[in-house]
C-alpha cells in the first residue's frame, strides 16, 4: 500500500500464517475485536469503500444489496436487555465485595475477642500462681510461729484469731486491687496496642510488596528492546496496525505471531501509549 511520505520505505512484509491479534487503542474501530487481519474489515463492514459484498456495486443506490454479512449495529433491540444484565451483574459484584469486606471485619473482631479471652485466662492463671505462692509463704510463717511457740521463745508476737482474720482480709483486698489494676492496664494495652501492631504489620507487608513490584517492573523495563522508525508508515487498519513517523521510538512487546512463531510484523508501544503491529523492516534496533 502506498503511503504519503517524502521517503518511500521498503516493501511491506507478508502477514504470518498464524495471523496477528487486534490491539485495542482509543481511536480504534468498535469492531476491531472481530478482526485479526486488515482485510477482515472489508468482510465485517460492508460499507468499506462503499463496495462491500454487493453484487450491484455501491455506486447504484436504487438497486438493493444482497449482502449476507449484516453490519454490527449498536442500537439493535436485543442490546437493551444485555446492557441491563451487565448493570445488574456489576451491582451484584459490588454487593459481593461489600460482603467480603464485612466478613473480613467480623473475622478480625472475632480474633480480637479470642485474644482478649486468652489474655484474661492467662491473668487468672497468674493470679492463681501468685495466690499459691502467698499461701505457701503464709503456711511457712505459721509453722515458724508454731515452732517458736513450742519452744517458748521470748520474742514471740502472738496474734489472736480475730487479728489474724483482719490482717488476712486487708491483705486479700490489697491483692484484689492490684489484680484489677493489672487487668485494666492489660485490656487498655490490648485495645490500643493490638490495632497499632496489626496496622504496622500490614504496612510493612505493603511496603515489601511494593518494593517487589517495583523491582519486577524495573526488571521488565530493562529486558525490553527499543527500535527507531527509519521510514513513515500509515496503518491500513487502526485496530491492528500502528502508524509510524520517522524518528519514533517504539518499545518492542512481541516479535511472534499468535501461534508463537517469529514473524516480520512486531507488536510495539509508542511513548504516547498507542500500541499495535508495525513492519520490522521499517525500523532499526537501538543498541544499549
Swiss-Prot record:
Domain named SH3: residues: 222-288
Keyword Transmembrane: yes
CDD domains, per database record: SH3_Pex13p_fungal (cd11771)
Sorted UniProt keywords: Membrane, Peroxisome, Protein transport, SH3 domain, Translocation, Transmembrane, Transmembrane helix, Transport
Compartments where found: Peroxisome membrane
Presence of the UniProt keyword Transmembrane in the record: yes
InterPro entries, per the entry: Peroxin-13_N, Pex13, SH3-like_dom_sf, SH3_domain
Official protein name in the record: Peroxisomal membrane protein pex13
Organism: Schizosaccharomyces pombe (strain 972 / ATCC 24843) (Fission yeast)
Higher taxonomy: Eukaryota, Fungi, Dikarya, Ascomycota, Taphrinomycotina
Amino acid at each position: 500500500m502506498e503511503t504519503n511520505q517524502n521517503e518511500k520505505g521498503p516493501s511491506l512484509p507478508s502477514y504470518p500464517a498464524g495471523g496477528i491479534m487486534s490491539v485495542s487503542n482509543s481511536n480504534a474501530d468498535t469492531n476491531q475485536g472481530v478482526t485479526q487481519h486488515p482485510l477482515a474489515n472489508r468482510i465485517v463492514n460492508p460499507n468499506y469503500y462503499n463496495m462491500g459484498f454487493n453484487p450491484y456495486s455501491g455506486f447504484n443506490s436504487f438497486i438493493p444489496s444482497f449482502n449476507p454479512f449484516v453490519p454490527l449495529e449498536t442500537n439493535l433491540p436485543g442490546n437493551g436487555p444485555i446492557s441491563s444484565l451487565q448493570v445488574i451483574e456489576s451491582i451484584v459484584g459490588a454487593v459481593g465485595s461489600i460482603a467480603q469486606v464485612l466478613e473480613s471485619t467480623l473475622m478480625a473482631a472475632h480474633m480480637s475477642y479470642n485474644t482478649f479471652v486468652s489474655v484474661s485466662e492467662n491473668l487468672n492463671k497468674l493470679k492463681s500462681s501468685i495466690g499459691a505462692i502467698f499461701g505457701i509463704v503464709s503456711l511457712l510463717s505459721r509453722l515458724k510461729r508454731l515452732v517458736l511457740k513450742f519452744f517458748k521463745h521470748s520474742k514471740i508476737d502472738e496474734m489472736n484469731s480475730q487479728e489474724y482474720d483482719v490482717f488476712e482480709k486487708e491483705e486479700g483486698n490489697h491483692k484484689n486491687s492490684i489484680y484489677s489494676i493489672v487487668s485494666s492496664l492489660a485490656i487498655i494495652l490490648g485495645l490500643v496496642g493490638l490495632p497499632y501492631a496489626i496496622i504496622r504489620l500490614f504496612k510493612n507487608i505493603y511496603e515489601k510488596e511494593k518494593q517487589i513490584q517495583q523491582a519486577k517492573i524495573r526488571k521488565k523495563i530493562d529486558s525490553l528492546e527499543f527500535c527507531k522508525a527509519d521510514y513513515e508508515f500509515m496503518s491500513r487498519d487502526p485496530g491492528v496496525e500502528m502508524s509510524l513517523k520517522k524518528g519514533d521510538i517504539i518499545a518492542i512487546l512481541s516479535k511472534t505471531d499468535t501461534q508463537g512463531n517469529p514473524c516480520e510484523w512486531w507488536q510495539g508501544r509508542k511513548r504516547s501509549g498507542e500500541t499495535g503491529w508495525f513492519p520490522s523492516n521499517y525500523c532499526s534496533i537501538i543498541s544499549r
